[in-house]
């Protein structure tokens, strides 16, 4: 490859001695000649009596004579018969905003020029050759020129990258390579054989002009988008093309969009798919090293004719509800009935591999609201106890502050557990836990939810302070813990009913008090499960979820509200896990461990999403997500960039809701236990920097060390989801890879691409139970 690049560069130098420059000034044309006003345009070749134009989109401040930027040449679709050079204009503007130089090339078509597909491919190769020949004047890297296109334009691009021949001998710079360095193909008609597209027009030489019949190891990295209901390009054709490329070692990415027809990527057909394909194209080019930094969602939003809708968001998060406590997630080993949660799952999407940011309360809530792991703060283990300054820094954006800035009303009804300070109602002095087991009525809090983006707060700090009811910034009354769950239901319903009286979108975050201790089911729920008080409490929690969903629906919000249901971590040992197991109920389902642990039962959580008429009913996603991803998902939903120095560990799972793959440069997900032990999940593999559970389940770390258990654990979650077989000694290379990635993500201050960030502390210790010898 290096030799090819040198030859290309050498040939370009020669070209400037033998070919006239076309770029001193854009060619002057009449308004009737110009397809895209106010954009530099040149003629890249003359053919059939026509000057074929190429339009150039440059990044702001581009200095062609001193820069070399990645480039792409796009070709419009239209069955080789017609089409508009403007088809990819918005793609060009977006990629130019990301630092690329983009070209939209006209080429000969049957309707206008009376030509055949051969001429289309010839012109495509000529356009790429022209860009490469003039690279130094255009400010283009000659070794980073992509070709892209839709339908027949996708064929032109693919043929330029894959098929030999079809060179125009009249090109003055014929010695310059016309082969692109990457392909960006939107439902391309790239199989032209007897069962493919356009066979009747290329019948005599289809083996030469059909990209699908010419795949070799020299082909460029390829990105393909296709709708599952495309009548011109069967999904099986795209899958075979993808497989054939990968078989010869070519990087290939295929994205199939369920239910979408040919041309679905155009904004006029589907604004959502238009946006998603551009973001996936951004990700693909980033993976090649052509783009840097996160995508520009805000700029992309500005390009849209119709701005994204602003649906309401209702997030219900249970406290200490195990994955196996939801009956539909654990039908064979779950004995607790949860009909309302089950109905929610049936009405939307179930994520089967969702994880809380931590195996315990406070860190998960911090990560959910900030999109950043809590161990990046001073809190390295355990939870906060209240009567102290808020864990969220004053200047740190939260999900609530972001949505509030976008015009949302924001409310938190339930448990905070991120610290706030109580001030004496008479003296204004800060109260402390030692002298006040319960803050008095009238006590003020100035650093609670309202200081971090919420308009309204009704709830409590955590279980020890549950009797102190706070509304907005004051303790308003004392009440028994048994009334808390019904109170939160009533307050949530009241808020939804009030929201129905205006058209302002709202974000309602409902972190419930249950089924965490104190386990206090109301009198009417006692004994209903026939299992235990904990099971009764779970059933009451399910009923509250049903009440909230009913309020959403009866107040007219069913279709424009996203409802998310989850838990902050696994089931607590306070539920009497062994007793439940004896009665046939497994709180973590098939998974090992429970709350506080690094094993799956500590942090694999229920995650259900209902978005009526958008998310498919009874659908599933096995993509791995984390509750820290909530922030980025909302910015993606509104097509906004993540604020600077925010959401450093957050990746949007919005594509998954559309049955698409999540795009991210984040390599894996970081787990942490109550004691601060780390774990790292990357694809099928999970590494634990702990000898035992890292939490409350036996063997705990002390006992595990006495038993001389290995310093780390490695599991293949595909073949061993129950974490029964530690294969760390057999796959030390894989353990080393995950450990290196974990260290990188910790040290970088972020696990995603974006503005350079830093941890709040240097006291992060990776090996809390001692490193292995030799260390990974």
Regions from the language model: what does each represent?
Residues 55, 235, 239-303:
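C-terminal catalytic histidine-bearing segment of alpha/beta-hydrolase fold enzymes
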């Amino acid at each position: 490859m290096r030799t090819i690049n040198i030859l290309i560069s050498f040939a370009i130098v020669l070209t400037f001695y033998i070919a006239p420059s076309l770029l001193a000034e854009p060619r002057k044309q009449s308004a009737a000649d110009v397809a895209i006003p106010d954009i530099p345009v040149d003629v890249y070749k003359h053919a059939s009596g026509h000057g074929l134009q190429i339009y150039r989109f440059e990044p702001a401040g581009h200095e062609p004579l001193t820069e070399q930027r990645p480039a792409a040449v796009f070709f419009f679709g239209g069955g080789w018969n017609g089409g508009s050079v403007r088809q990819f204009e918005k793609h060009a503007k977006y990629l130019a905003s990301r630092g690329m130089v983009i070209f939209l090339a006209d080429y000969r078509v049957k309707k206008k020029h009376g030509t055949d597909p051969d001429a289309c491919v010839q012109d495509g190769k000529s356009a790429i050759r022209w860009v490469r020949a003039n690279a130094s004047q255009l400010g283009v890297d000659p070794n980073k020129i992509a070709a892209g296109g839709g339908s027949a334009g996708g064929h032109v691009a693919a043929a330029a990258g894959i098929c030999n021949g079809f060179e125009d001998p009249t090109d003055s710079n014929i010695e310059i390579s016309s082969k692109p360095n990457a392909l960006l193909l939107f439902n391309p008609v790239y199989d032209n054989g007897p069962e493919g597209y356009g066979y009747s027009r290329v019948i005599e030489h289809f083996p030469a002009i059909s990209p699908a019949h010419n795949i070799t190891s020299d082909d460029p990295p390829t990105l393909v988008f296709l709708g599952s209901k495309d009548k011109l390009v069967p999904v099986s054709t795209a899958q075979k093309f993808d497989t054939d490329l990968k078989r010869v070692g070519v990087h290939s990415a295929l994205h199939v969009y369920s239910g979408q027809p040919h041309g679905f990527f155009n904004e006029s057909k589907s604004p959502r798919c238009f946006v998603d394909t551009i973001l996936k194209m951004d990700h693909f080019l980033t993976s090649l090293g052509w783009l840097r930094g996160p995508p520009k969602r805000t700029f992309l939003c500005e390009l849209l004719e119709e701005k994204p809708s602003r649906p309401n968001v209702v997030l219900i998060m249970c406290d200490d509800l195990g994955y196996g406590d939801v009956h539909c997630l654990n039908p064979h080993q779950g004995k607790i009935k949860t009909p309302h949660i089950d109905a929610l799952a049936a009405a939307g999407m179930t994520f089967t591999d969702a994880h809380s940011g931590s195996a315990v309360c406070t860190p998960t809530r911090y990560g959910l609201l900030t999109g950043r792991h809590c161990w990046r703060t001073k809190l390295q283990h355990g939870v906060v106890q209240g009567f102290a300054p808020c864990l969220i820094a004053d200047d740190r954006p939260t999900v609530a502050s972001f949505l509030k800035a976008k015009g949302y009303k924001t409310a938190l009804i339930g448990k905070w557990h991120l610290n706030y300070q109580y001030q004496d109602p008479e003296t204004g002095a800060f109260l402390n836990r030692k002298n006040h087991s319960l803050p008095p009525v009238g006590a003020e809090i100035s650093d609670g939810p309202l200081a971090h983006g919420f308009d309204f707060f009704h709830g409590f700090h955590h279980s020890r302070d549950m009797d102190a009811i706070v509304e907005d910034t004051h303790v308003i009354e004392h009440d028994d813990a048994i009334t808390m769950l019904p109170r939160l239901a009533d307050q949530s319903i009241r808020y939804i009913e009030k929201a129905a009286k205006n058209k302002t979108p709202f974000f309602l975050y409902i972190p419930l008090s249950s089924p965490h201790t104190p386990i206090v089911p109301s009198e009417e729920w006692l004994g209903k499960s026939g299992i235990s008080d904990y099971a009764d409490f779970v059933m009451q929690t399910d009923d509250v979820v049903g009440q909230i969903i009913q309020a959403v629906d009866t107040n007219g919000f069913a279709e424009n509200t996203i409802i998310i249901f989850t838990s902050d971590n696994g089931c607590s040992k306070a539920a009497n896990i062994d007793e439940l197991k004896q009665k046939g109920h497994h709180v973590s389902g098939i998974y090992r461990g429970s709350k506080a642990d690094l094993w799956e039962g500590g942090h694999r959580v229920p995650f259900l999403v209902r978005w009526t008429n958008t998310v498919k009913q009874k659908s599933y996603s096995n993509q791995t997500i984390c509750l820290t991803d909530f922030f980025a998902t909302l910015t993606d939903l509104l097509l906004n960039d993540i604020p600077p120095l925010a959401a450093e560990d957050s990746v949007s799972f919005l594509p998954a809701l559309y049955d698409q793959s999540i795009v991210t440069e984040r390599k894996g997900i970081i787990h942490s236990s109550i004691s601060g032990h780390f774990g790292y999940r990357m694809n099928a593999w999970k590494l634990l920097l702990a000898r035992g559970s890292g939490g409350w389940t036996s063997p705990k770390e002390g006992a595990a060390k006495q038993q001389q258990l290995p310093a780390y654990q490695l599991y293949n979650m595909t073949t061993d989801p129950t974490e029964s077989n530690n294969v760390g000694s057999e796959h030390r290379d894989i353990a080393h890879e995950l450990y290196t990635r974990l260290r990188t993500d910790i040290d970088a201050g972020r696990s995603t691409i974006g503005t350079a960030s830093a941890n709040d502390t240097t006291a992060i210790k990776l090996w809390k139970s001692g490193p292995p010898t030799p260390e990974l």
